[in-house]
Amino acid sequence: MELRRNIYQKLLEWKKEDSGQVLEVKGARQVGKTYILKKFGRENFRKMVYISMAERSGEDFLRCLSEASEWNPGEPRPRQPVRKALEMFDSEFTDDKETIVIIDEIQESSTVYNQIRTLAREFQCYVIVTGSYLGRLIEREFFLPAGDTEHIIMEPLTFDEFLDVFGERELYETIDLYGKNPAGDYEKLKEYYEIYQKIGGYPAVVVCYAQYKDVSRCYAKIEKLMSIFADESKRYFEDIIDKNLFEKLFNAIALLMIQEKQGVRDLTSELSKIAYQEESGRMTKKMINHAISWLQESHIIGYASKAVDCDYMQIKENSRYYFLDMGVSHYFLRGTGAPYDVIKGLLAENFVYLSLHRKLENTREIAGIVPWFASYEKINGELDFYVRSLLDYKNYGIEVKSTDAVAKTGKKLLEDGKLDYLYLLKGETKGGIADEKIFTIPLCLADRVTYRRTHGLD
C-alpha cells in the first residue's frame, strides 16, 4: 500500500527553490522518511545516490572517504576528498542538478555529518540528510553547520493523510466548518477520528488497520515500535543504570498528563517522583533531563508553555508534555488504567496540540515557539489553548471538548476582553457561529482552522 504524504510537496518546493543548502529531514523513527525520500529521488532526478550510515553502504562510503582523504606529511593535501569519495562509491555519480545524494541515519557518523558544509558549498547536486536520532548531534564531535542547512520535519500521518488511505480526504478538505454539509458527512469524519485517536499515524500501524480493521493488532504494533525505540536509544546513553528508563518515563508522562491541569514549575522533578517514587540515588535530575531532551529531539514528545492571563508577554516555558503521535498517546494513557472519558478528553487536547504544533513548524500564522495554554487567575481557571495570531494580531482562545461540554473559562476570558475570539472544538457537533465571536467547530477539523478574522480557509 502506497501512502500519500504531505511532505512530498515540500520536497518538490525545496527542489524548485534550489537554495544550495543541504536539506535535513527530521522525524521520529519509522515515520516513513527513507521511503518517501527514495520515492522523491527516483521520480525527480536522473541519478540518485543513497547511502545509509546504519547499513553496509555507510561502511563502504566511510572507506571511500578515508581512502580519498589519505595524506602523508610533505605531500600535497588531497583536493575535494568528498567528491572523490562519492565518485569511488558510485562510478556513475555526476555533480549536476540531475543528481541527488541522500545520506540516511547520518547521526551514526560524525565524520560524514561534519562534511555537510562541504556538500552545501562545493557541490551542484542536491543533498538530503536524515536520521531518526538526530538528538545525538548535541555531542561534541558533531559540528553544527549553521547557515548551510534547512530542515523539514516529517511526522506520523496527519488526520488528512490518514483519511486519504480510506478515500475520504476530499470530504475532509471541502466540508464546511460550521455545519452546512449533511449530518452524515460530519458523522463519517467523526467515526474515522475515533479510530485515528486510538491508533495514530505511524505508517506500519495505519497499514495494519487498513488491512485487518483490528485495533488490537495496532496496539501490538505500537508496543513494538516503542520497545524498539527504547532499546535503540539506550545505546546512545553511557549513564543509564536503569534499563527500563524510557518505559518508565513514557508511563510517567501519561500519568502527569492525567494529574496536572494547571502546569507545574519543574516537570523534571515531577516526572522523577512518578517514575521512581522518590527512590533516592537511582537517577539524578541531570540524567532525567538528558532522557527527556532525547525524547524531544527524537520527536516522541513535545511540550506546551503557559500564558498567564492570556498574556503573550507572560509565558512560562516547559509547562506541559504531549506525545507527538495520537496512537502512542492513547497507548500509554490507556496503560494508566484511567477511565475512558478522562483518556478521551486528554486525547482531544493532544490532537489539537499537534495541530498547533504543525502550524508553528510550517507557517508563520501564530506566535511562539511551542503551543500555549493559558491560566486565568481571576477565576482560577484554565484555557485549553491560547493563540496570538500573526495574521490579524488578535487573541484566540481554544476550548477542546470531546463531548458537548460548556467552556466556562473561555467564555469568561472573552467577556472580560482577554480574548477577541473563541473557538470551541467539540467532538459532538456539526459546528456553528454565535455572535461573530464564538465559533463551534468539529474537533476532527482542527487542522482546517485558521487564525484570522475571516475564519475561513486560506
Predicted regions and their residues:
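Hydrophobic anchor at the beta1->P-loop junction of P-loop NTPases
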Residues: 25
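Accessory nucleic acid-recognition modules appended to NTPase machines
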Residues: 211-383, 389
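Conserved catalytic cores of phosphodiester-cleaving nucleases, focusing on short active-site segments
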Residues: 127, 352, 356, 383-404
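Conserved lysine of the Walker
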Residues: 33
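Interdomain motor-coupling "hinge/lid" segment immediately C-terminal to the ATP-binding subdomain
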Residues: 142-259
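Hydrophobic positions on the alpha1 helix immediately C-terminal to the Walker A/P-loop
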Residues: 36, 40
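Sensor-1/coupling segment of RecA-like P-loop NTPase cores
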Residues: 121-142
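N-terminal pre-Walker A segment at the start of P-loop NTPase domains
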Residues: 1-18
